Each structure stands twice: as C-alpha cells, then as structure tokens.
UniProtKB/Swiss-Prot annotation:
Residues 178-195 have a biased composition (Low complexity). HAMAP family: UPF0441 (MF_01188). This is UPF0441 protein YgiB. The gene is ygiB. Belongs to the UPF0441 family. It comes from the Bacteria. Residues 204-223 have a biased composition (Polar residues). Coiled coil: none annotated. Residues 178-223 are annotated as: Disordered. InterPro entries: Biofilm_formation_YgiB.
Length: 223
C-alpha cells in the first residue's frame, strides 16, 4: 500500500509540474513566433534604372538588367491606368505619363472606352524599382516597380509608391530599406481606369494606415 501511495504522489507531482511549466512553454513558443515574424521582413534596394543597380552591385549587371526589365513589364501590368492623358498628367505631372500597351492588364471593354476618348489609355512612367534577393537559394532577384508624382498637389509628390499606393518614402534612388515580404509580391493587374486624383487618394489612405500601424506598434512596445 505504501508503494501505491508513493506512485500516486509521483504522479501528482508530475501532473503539478506539467501544469506549472505550461506558461513557460507558452512563453518560449511566443519568442519563436516573434522571431518568425521578424524574419518576414526583407531588405531591398531602390534604384532608378539598371545602370544605378549595376553601379551598386559590381559583377551583377545581367541580374540588374533582368530585374529592371521585369519591373517595367510589371509596371505595364499593374500601374494605374487613365482614360486620358490629361487625367494622368493631373496626377503625376507633365512629362511623367506614357501611352500604355493595349494588352497591359486592361479588360477589353475598358480598352474600348479609353480608345474611344483618346485613342489609347495612359499610365505613369516607372520612376524606379525595389530590388531584393529571392528566397530559396538566392538564385535571382525579386523586383517591384515604383511610381512618383511631380505634381506638388498630389499625395504622391516626391514619394516612391507602388501600384497599390503604398508609400516608400522620398523618391531618392540608392537607398536601402526593410519592407515586409508582401511588398515584393506581384500586384493584381489593373483592369479598370482610375478617375482623376483617384491614385492620389489611395496614396493618402495608405499613408494614414501606415502611420496608424506605426503608432500602434510603438505604443505596444512601450507597454
């Protein structure tokens, strides 16, 4: 009987210990989860063109050219599209717009609308691009086109923004920054035209959301 009681006591001690270790295990798990979140960021470089990239990465001229050309193709597919040149210029400034290829993501009915009014539709010039190492061996680079406005009245004035309107700071090539990996993910193709000022509104909303998120993060870290 004494032996049986001893076994029961050991079982109770084991159960008690397991229960009281659980918070520690949870804390360790949380640390690993936070470490995983930190690894979700990626360091990217911002360039205006392939020459800028090549100058900053000696021996990588071919990769820089490929990334630049891929960014141009991505810009054609995802950049905001306008039915008229005037709408595009009002947002991005004189000399910052070009006719977009008819196949660049637009639905046939929207192509017809744009062509009826101006013979084509319009998009901003690619002002630069983000470039970062691809995961999985680093065999190549991921890239994301960036746009910028020369119109002081636009929320995108003097800023690098992506096709979704997210702001990446001053339009100064040669910078390196850390961005979420989602920033380098392909954006959906633009299938409709944007009204005048519509892209600027998107930039303003994105900037407000970014500031709000940054403030929340700061408060959380500060307790």
């Amino acid at each position: 009987m004494k032996r049986t009681k001893s076994i029961h006591h050991a079982s109770f001690r084991k159960s008690w210990g397991a229960r009281h270790l659980t918070p520690v295990a949870l804390a360790v798990t949380a640390v690993f989860m936070l470490a995983g979140c930190e690894k979700s960021d990626e360091t990217v470089s911002l360039y205006q063109n392939a020459d800028d990239c090549s100058a900053a990465n000696p021996g990588k001229s071919a990769e820089c050219t490929t990334a630049y050309n891929n960014a141009l193709k991505e810009a054609e597919r995802t950049a905001p599209k306008y039915a008229t040149r005037e709408d595009c210029v009002a947002e991005f400034g004189e000399g910052q717009c070009q006719q977009a290829p008819a196949q660049a993501g637009m639905a046939p009915e929207n192509q017809a609308q744009a062509q009826q009014s101006s013979g084509s539709f319009w998009m901003p010039l690619m002002a630069g691009y983000m470039m970062g190492r691809l995961m999985g061996g680093g065999a190549g680079f991921a890239q994301q086109p960036l746009f910028s406005s020369k119109n002081p009245a636009s929320p995108a004035y003097g800023k690098y923004t992506d096709a979704a309107g997210k702001n990446y700071g001053a339009a100064q090539p040669g910078r390196t920054m850390t961005v979420p990996k989602t920033a380098m993910a392909p954006k959906p193709a633009t299938t409709t035209t944007v009204t005048r000022g519509g892209f600027g509104e998107s930039v303003a909303k994105q900037s407000t959301m970014q500031r709000s998120a940054a403030g929340t993060s700061t408060r959380s870290m500060g307790g």
